[in-house]
Amino acid sequence: MLKSILIFLVLNAPAQANLGSYKDGRLINPNTNQPYTGNIDIINEDWGKDAVEFNKDYVDGVLHGTEKSYYQSGKLKSLGSFKRGILDGIVTGYYEDGTIQVRATYDNGVKQGRVIRYYPNGTKQVESFYTDDKFDGVRTTWYENGKPI
């Protein structure tokens, strides 16, 4: 069964208003019929009434700023940055206990530089290098005890 996800607009006021739809690739605020600027919590009702699955920043209806995803427990699952709707900057994925699972860098939507995956115990698992979204160079792997493979 598909998750029923409702999008809510986070306002400074205590109430939350239901967000509208996308028009020409921009998120439209149904209260003003204009592209939305601000922070949004996306609620997963299957998890509970106020269970946030995503938190996103928008400017002029386009993702711009931080995007966070959460586990059902409420703990941070991933953190990334967007510029004008395109992934840009460091993206970090986390295990539910908060340990880093993966870290990568994007430049204008393209994977660039070092990508590191970690075991749940925090030890490096794989380190790879990318140029223009393609593997480039040496890939190093480790056993969970930290010894190189």
What are these model-predicted stretches?
Residues 3-13:
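Sec-dependent N-terminal signal peptides
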Residues 11-149:
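Glycine/tyrosine- and acidic-biased, solvent-exposed loop/turn segments at the edges of beta-strands
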